[in-house]
């Protein structure tokens, strides 16, 4: 027939054809009646109250310790289940719990003997871990696993723990007072620091405000300087533009004057050409015509040079420099005119001299006859021979004029009659 069990127990079948016995944890198994036997073992967790009364610790102080342990037979591990069946099969849960309790208590006492009261009291976790470790390695051979172990209570009959607590309490109270004093001190220090930081922050804020005001004023001053500079530059540019415009107008005016003077020069040149033609047609003597031509050409060139010099001076310089340049140009033109006259006199020596003499003779005659024009009356004294009256006066004047060439010859060394009869020489 079939037998079943829950997950909290295991079945062991032995007998005919069951060597070794079959162990089933939480399941079913077929058993032949009369020739096979079935037994059950509990897999429930057992809670053990492990008490160790008046155990002497490492310093010889007796204390009592109570621990709580959770143990059970391990059904998933076949080896541990086989070991548990060998040791506990047929026993009740109470008997199994008693065996495990005795084992745990022995290990608990051994751990207590190797530790001080302070270590057990202050470091319960360490004590629990050592008991769990030592007991687990021993109970596993029985097929029992320790699920957990916790230290529940520690007490003694000598008030050792109470005294230890008083000392600790006093220490704690002292630490509390010290901590309170330190806290007050720290609070005062922090308050002073806070006030100092507040004052420092206020000063820093004022400093930052002063810096900001300074930066604002500096930037404003820089902007004002830049604005004034731009304004001055604009005014200067306007003045420069006005000056340039005036200069351009003056240059255009000078150019117009130059053009006008050039036109005047052209007109004068045309007039000179016309007069030269008239001179050629009217003047009989070639020397006079040539001299007149050279003089007019020199005057024209002088006028042209003067106007060109004035125009160039006006376009290059302003009025003062232009006038100085024009004066120099006039001087050069006059010098050139004199040079042309000198060349003409050199080319036509006798004719030129004759021309000058003939030109000056009327002035000489005028100067000679000048006293006669201012005389109120003329008294003629005759020696008794020759003409009388007005004819006498005319004869005297003509006699003076006939002696004039001789006077000129004595003064200048030039004979008018000889110059007049000599042919003209050309270079």
From Swiss-Prot:
<dbReference type="GO" id="GO:0070062">
    <property type="term" value="C:extracellular exosome"/>
</dbReference>
<dbReference type="GO" id="GO:0016020">
    <property type="term" value="C:membrane"/>
</dbReference>
<dbReference type="GO" id="GO:0035023">
    <property type="term" value="P:regulation of Rho protein signal transduction"/>
</dbReference>
<dbReference type="GO" id="GO:0098978">
    <property type="term" value="C:glutamatergic synapse"/>
</dbReference>
<feature type="modified residue" description="Phosphoserine">
    <location>
        <position position="385"/>
    </location>
</feature>
<dbReference type="GO" id="GO:0016600">
    <property type="term" value="C:flotillin complex"/>
</dbReference>
<dbReference type="GO" id="GO:0034976">
    <property type="term" value="P:response to endoplasmic reticulum stress"/>
</dbReference>
<dbReference type="GO" id="GO:0032092">
    <property type="term" value="P:positive regulation of protein binding"/>
</dbReference>
<keyword id="KW-0597">Phosphoprotein</keyword>
<dbReference type="GO" id="GO:0044291">
    <property type="term" value="C:cell-cell contact zone"/>
</dbReference>
<comment type="subunit">
    <text>Heterooligomeric complex of flotillin-1 and flotillin-2 and caveolin-1 and caveolin-2. Interacts with ECPAS.</text>
</comment>
<keyword id="KW-0967">Endosome</keyword>
<dbReference type="GO" id="GO:0050821">
    <property type="term" value="P:protein stabilization"/>
</dbReference>
<dbReference type="InterPro" id="IPR036013">
    <property type="entry name" value="Band_7/SPFH_dom_sf"/>
</dbReference>
<dbReference type="GO" id="GO:0045121">
    <property type="term" value="C:membrane raft"/>
</dbReference>
<dbReference type="Pfam" id="PF01145">
    <property type="entry name" value="Band_7"/>
</dbReference>
<dbReference type="GO" id="GO:0005912">
    <property type="term" value="C:adherens junction"/>
</dbReference>
<dbReference type="GO" id="GO:0034116">
    <property type="term" value="P:positive regulation of heterotypic cell-cell adhesion"/>
</dbReference>
<dbReference type="GO" id="GO:0005886">
    <property type="term" value="C:plasma membrane"/>
</dbReference>
<dbReference type="InterPro" id="IPR027705">
    <property type="entry name" value="Flotillin_fam"/>
</dbReference>
<dbReference type="GO" id="GO:0005911">
    <property type="term" value="C:cell-cell junction"/>
</dbReference>
<dbReference type="InterPro" id="IPR001107">
    <property type="entry name" value="Band_7"/>
</dbReference>
<dbReference type="GO" id="GO:0001934">
    <property type="term" value="P:positive regulation of protein phosphorylation"/>
</dbReference>
<dbReference type="GO" id="GO:0005901">
    <property type="term" value="C:caveola"/>
</dbReference>
<dbReference type="GO" id="GO:0034451">
    <property type="term" value="C:centriolar satellite"/>
</dbReference>
<dbReference type="GO" id="GO:0032728">
    <property type="term" value="P:positive regulation of interferon-beta production"/>
</dbReference>
<dbReference type="GO" id="GO:0034141">
    <property type="term" value="P:positive regulation of toll-like receptor 3 signaling pathway"/>
</dbReference>
<dbReference type="GO" id="GO:0048786">
    <property type="term" value="C:presynaptic active zone"/>
</dbReference>
<dbReference type="GO" id="GO:2000049">
    <property type="term" value="P:positive regulation of cell-cell adhesion mediated by cadherin"/>
</dbReference>
<dbReference type="GO" id="GO:0044854">
    <property type="term" value="P:plasma membrane raft assembly"/>
</dbReference>
<dbReference type="GO" id="GO:0035255">
    <property type="term" value="F:ionotropic glutamate receptor binding"/>
</dbReference>
<dbReference type="GO" id="GO:0098691">
    <property type="term" value="C:dopaminergic synapse"/>
</dbReference>
<keyword id="KW-0472">Membrane</keyword>
<dbReference type="GO" id="GO:0005925">
    <property type="term" value="C:focal adhesion"/>
</dbReference>
<dbReference type="GO" id="GO:0005768">
    <property type="term" value="C:endosome"/>
</dbReference>
<feature type="modified residue" description="Phosphoserine">
    <location>
        <position position="163"/>
    </location>
</feature>
<dbReference type="GO" id="GO:0042470">
    <property type="term" value="C:melanosome"/>
</dbReference>
<dbReference type="GO" id="GO:0048643">
    <property type="term" value="P:positive regulation of skeletal muscle tissue development"/>
</dbReference>
<dbReference type="GO" id="GO:0043123">
    <property type="term" value="P:positive regulation of canonical NF-kappaB signal transduction"/>
</dbReference>
<dbReference type="GO" id="GO:0032226">
    <property type="term" value="P:positive regulation of synaptic transmission, dopaminergic"/>
</dbReference>
<dbReference type="GO" id="GO:0005765">
    <property type="term" value="C:lysosomal membrane"/>
</dbReference>
<dbReference type="GO" id="GO:1901890">
    <property type="term" value="P:positive regulation of cell junction assembly"/>
</dbReference>
